[in-house]
Structure formats: C-alpha cells, structure tokens
Amino acid sequence: MKTTILLMFLWGLSCALPVARYQNTESKSSEEWKGHLAQTPTPPLESSESSEESKLSSEEQANEDPSDSTESEEVLGLDDQQHVHRPAGGLSRRGGSEGDNKDDDEDESGDDTFGDDDGGPGPEERRSGGDSRLGSDEDSADTTRSREDSTPQGDEGARDTTSESRDLDREDEGNSRPEGGDSTPDSDSEEHWVGGGSEGDSSHGDGSEFDDEGMQSDDPGAYRSERGNSRISDAGLKSTQSKGDDEEQASTQDSHESPAAAYPRRKFFRKSRLPEEDGRGELDDSRTIEVMSDSTENPDSKEAGLGQSREHSKSESRQESEENRSPEDSQDVQDPSSESSQEVDLPSQENSSESQEEALHESRGDNPDNATSHSREHQADSESSEEDVLDKPSDSESTSTEEQADSESHESLRSSEESPESTEEQNSSSQEGAQTQSRSQESPSEEDDGSDSQDSSRSKEDSNSTESVSSSEEEAQTKNTEVESRKLTVDAYHNKPIGDQDDNDCQDGY
C-alpha cells in the first residue's frame, strides 16, 4: 500500500511539473545529494524513488535561491529516513518492484508522461527498475545508462552522482537478486509482452487479472487450439448430416438431370440443420433414425416416385415455355402425367396426412407443411382466378413441390414408425380418408381447373361482347342527341320571322 501511494504521489508530481529537461543544478546541491546517497544503502527500488524525488525537488528549485536547495535536501533526508524505517522484507520489495514494473510498462507503452514531461525522472526510474528486475548482463545496462546520462545535465558533480548511484544500484542489485527472485520471471514476461511477443502475462503485476478474460486474443497458440477444437466438433456434426445426405443422394442420383433435383436435397439439408439449433439431443436420435430408415427403405417405390416426380417437373418446365402458344394442348399433356405421378405417390400421400401433424412437429420445423399449404392455396387461387396462362405454371410448380414434400414426409414417417407407437392403426384408419382427400384435391382439381379456365374464357368473351354492345349503344345515343341538337339549331335558324334579318335573336324594329 505504501509503495502504491508513493508511486501515485510521484506520478502526480511528474504530471504537475512539466519543467524544462535536465536544468543545470548547482554543484553544492549535487554534492549534498551524493552524500545522502552514500549514507543510505537502501534497496534499489527505494533508492531510485529517493533519487527521483531529489531530482524533482532540485529541478523545481533550480531557478530559485541556492538556499532553497538545502531545504529540498532536508526534505529528501526525511524521505530517506522514511524509506529506511519501512520493512525491507521480500514481500514488500516484490510488491514495490511489481508496482515499479507497472509504471515502467506504462512509460514504455506511451500512456504515462514520465519520459515526456520531465525527462529526468523518467529514464532514471526506468534505469533503476530495469536494474531491479532484469537478469541481463550489467554492461548493456551501463551503456544505456551512460548514453542517457550523456545528455546535458549540468556540472560534473551531477555526473559523478549518477555514476555513484549506479554503483550503489549495482551493489544493491547483487544483494537483492536472490531475494527478489520471485519478481524476475513475471517482469521478464512483461517485457516480452510489451515488445509484442506472445507470452500470456499482461502488463499489470503477475498477470493474473487478465489471463482469463481479455488477453487471450494476444496468445495465438491458445486461439488456434480453440479454433481447432471448434472445427473438430463442427466436422463431427457435418459428418452426421452428410451421411443421411449421401444416402438420399445415392438413391436419387439416377434421375438427377433436371434442375429441380437439387431442391429436395437442399430441403433435407435444411431439415437436418434447423432443429439442430433447437434441441440437439432429440435431433441426433431422429437423424440417426432417418439414416437407418433411408437404408432400410424400399428403394424401388421411392425411386419410382422420385423419378416420376422429376419427369413430371421436366414436363412442366417444358410446358411453361409451350403454354403461351397453346394452353389447351399443354393442359392435355399435363393431366395424364400428373395423374400417373399421383397414382404412384398415393401411398406417400396417405402417410403425409398423418406425418404432417405428428412427425414433422417432432423432427423438423416447417418445410413440408408450408409446401403443402402453399400448394393448396395455389390450387384454390387457380380455381377462383380467371387467367389461364399465368395459373398453369404456378399450379404445376405447386404439384411438384407437393410431391417432393410428400416423399420427404414419407421418410420422416418411416423414422417415426420405428418408435413403436400406435401409428400403424392410425395409418390404416386414415388411408381411406387420405385416398379420397388426395384424389379429390389433386386429380379432379386439375380437371376442374381446365373446365374453370374454359368457362372463365367464355365468360370473358361474353363480357367483352356485352361491353362492346353497350359501348355501341352509348355511341349511337350520343350521335342521336348531337343530330337532334343540330336539327334544332337549323330549324330555329330557318324559321325566323320575316322582319328579323340579322343573326341575333331579337327581332328588328322593337
């Protein structure tokens, strides 16, 4: 605590005294300072602080009377006695050196104003701090010190004092190095950190404050290891997804030429990725069940259904280009292909009515429900709308999406059937209703679409004819009124009285 308070006081002094650097001090004050340093063999940290205080006070009062310098030396003597009375154990010295390291690192990083405001105390403190904590050879430290001391400082006495204080610091360094051995590894790692290296210790003391929180990004080794762990876990998840994806891809690769073939695979990938965010425990089980059901599934019926749905989507993509020329022919082409694909997909549609309510809410979020509801909305819209050519492609797209969604719901129903519940009874009970529902929804709806579209075209022609008749009647009425008004004006002009010869209405002579 005392060291931190003293350091705060010194920091305030150095901020409050931006005096000129290295002013010429009198030889008398420098000799007295030398005597004080020789009297007090304190540990290196305290000697550096006392020398800093003495230098501050001597710089403060350099321009004043020489009698004031003796007062500053008395103040310095009091400070030195304070330093002597302080306990010089290993703990206090280590705490002081840590605090000194803190100031030193601030000085090096440029946040503090020691080296900038008053150039004297900054390098002096940095020198002594470096002596107390560096385990490097003394010759390099001596060269840096002599280089810093070669700046114009005044009399030769001041240089003698700096050299003697260096000798004292060296002696005390030799004494205090076994005691303060605890602080040397921390300070070494601190210097590495300030120099831009990758040691984990921060610039404050022993580095335990920021080890767990902020300074992890400075350590590239730990960052790489975390990244590698996250990549391994991601690779595990992706491998479980890609298993099911590869099996479905192998079963559907025979009829893969059309561009709509990528759609159910993408959907399956989304299906396995969406619930992963919600509940990973249940979804791993459901994913493995889906993979097993894909391997144990009847491949012939699935390939037949998917192949016909893909041929159906091919024929629809051709029809979209042909429908602008001949909508009635494309309607004839569309109906048998859609009916044949619906006959193949009937068992999957029977299962879909149940899997849309139960299995889909368990294993995946939204896709087939949305697709079937969208397709039903499209069918309802196409029944009520009056535009032929625009409704046919949307209707064919909705049927293809519904068939793909039903095939996928068939897979998810297989996964839900493996959990032995009473789904088979519900299947058998809901088969008849689903058959009638699917037939009444799809195959008659397309025929109704054709008849409705023909009726709508007839009603359009009728409305056009009635509009043309009504417009012609209105034109005839307007013509009749114009003719009548002209007749009236001509009659009025010709039936004038005899005495009225000019063009105005009033008669002449009145």
From Swiss-Prot:
<feature type="compositionally biased region" description="Basic and acidic residues">
    <location>
        <begin position="407"/>
        <end position="417"/>
    </location>
</feature>
<feature type="compositionally biased region" description="Polar residues">
    <location>
        <begin position="333"/>
        <end position="343"/>
    </location>
</feature>
<dbReference type="GO" id="GO:0030198">
    <property type="term" value="P:extracellular matrix organization"/>
</dbReference>
<feature type="glycosylation site" description="N-linked (GlcNAc...) asparagine">
    <location>
        <position position="427"/>
    </location>
</feature>
<comment type="subunit">
    <text>Interacts with importin alpha.</text>
</comment>
<feature type="glycosylation site" description="N-linked (GlcNAc...) asparagine">
    <location>
        <position position="351"/>
    </location>
</feature>
<feature type="compositionally biased region" description="Basic and acidic residues">
    <location>
        <begin position="273"/>
        <end position="288"/>
    </location>
</feature>
<feature type="compositionally biased region" description="Basic and acidic residues">
    <location>
        <begin position="299"/>
        <end position="328"/>
    </location>
</feature>
<keyword id="KW-0272">Extracellular matrix</keyword>
<dbReference type="GO" id="GO:0031214">
    <property type="term" value="P:biomineral tissue development"/>
</dbReference>
<feature type="compositionally biased region" description="Acidic residues">
    <location>
        <begin position="500"/>
        <end position="510"/>
    </location>
</feature>
<feature type="compositionally biased region" description="Acidic residues">
    <location>
        <begin position="101"/>
        <end position="119"/>
    </location>
</feature>
<dbReference type="GO" id="GO:0005576">
    <property type="term" value="C:extracellular region"/>
</dbReference>
<protein>
    <recommendedName>
        <fullName>Dentin matrix acidic phosphoprotein 1</fullName>
    </recommendedName>
</protein>
<feature type="short sequence motif" description="Cell attachment site">
    <location>
        <begin position="364"/>
        <end position="366"/>
    </location>
</feature>
<feature type="region of interest" description="Disordered">
    <location>
        <begin position="23"/>
        <end position="510"/>
    </location>
</feature>
<dbReference type="Pfam" id="PF07263">
    <property type="entry name" value="DMP1"/>
</dbReference>
<feature type="glycosylation site" description="N-linked (GlcNAc...) asparagine">
    <location>
        <position position="370"/>
    </location>
</feature>
<keyword id="KW-0091">Biomineralization</keyword>
<feature type="signal peptide">
    <location>
        <begin position="1"/>
        <end position="16"/>
    </location>
</feature>
<dbReference type="GO" id="GO:0005737">
    <property type="term" value="C:cytoplasm"/>
</dbReference>
<dbReference type="GO" id="GO:0050840">
    <property type="term" value="F:extracellular matrix binding"/>
</dbReference>
<feature type="compositionally biased region" description="Acidic residues">
    <location>
        <begin position="61"/>
        <end position="77"/>
    </location>
</feature>
<dbReference type="GO" id="GO:0005634">
    <property type="term" value="C:nucleus"/>
</dbReference>
<dbReference type="GO" id="GO:0031012">
    <property type="term" value="C:extracellular matrix"/>
</dbReference>
<feature type="compositionally biased region" description="Basic and acidic residues">
    <location>
        <begin position="123"/>
        <end position="180"/>
    </location>
</feature>
<feature type="glycosylation site" description="N-linked (GlcNAc...) asparagine">
    <location>
        <position position="464"/>
    </location>
</feature>
<keyword id="KW-0539">Nucleus</keyword>
<dbReference type="InterPro" id="IPR009889">
    <property type="entry name" value="DMP1"/>
</dbReference>
<feature type="compositionally biased region" description="Basic and acidic residues">
    <location>
        <begin position="481"/>
        <end position="499"/>
    </location>
</feature>
<dbReference type="GO" id="GO:0001503">
    <property type="term" value="P:ossification"/>
</dbReference>
<keyword id="KW-0325">Glycoprotein</keyword>
<keyword id="KW-0963">Cytoplasm</keyword>
<feature type="compositionally biased region" description="Basic and acidic residues">
    <location>
        <begin position="358"/>
        <end position="367"/>
    </location>
</feature>
<keyword id="KW-0732">Signal</keyword>
<keyword id="KW-0964">Secreted</keyword>
<keyword id="KW-0597">Phosphoprotein</keyword>
<comment type="function">
    <text>May have a dual function during osteoblast differentiation. In the nucleus of undifferentiated osteoblasts, unphosphorylated form acts as a transcriptional component for activation of osteoblast-specific genes like osteocalcin. During the osteoblast to osteocyte transition phase it is phosphorylated and exported into the extracellular matrix, where it regulates nucleation of hydroxyapatite.</text>
</comment>
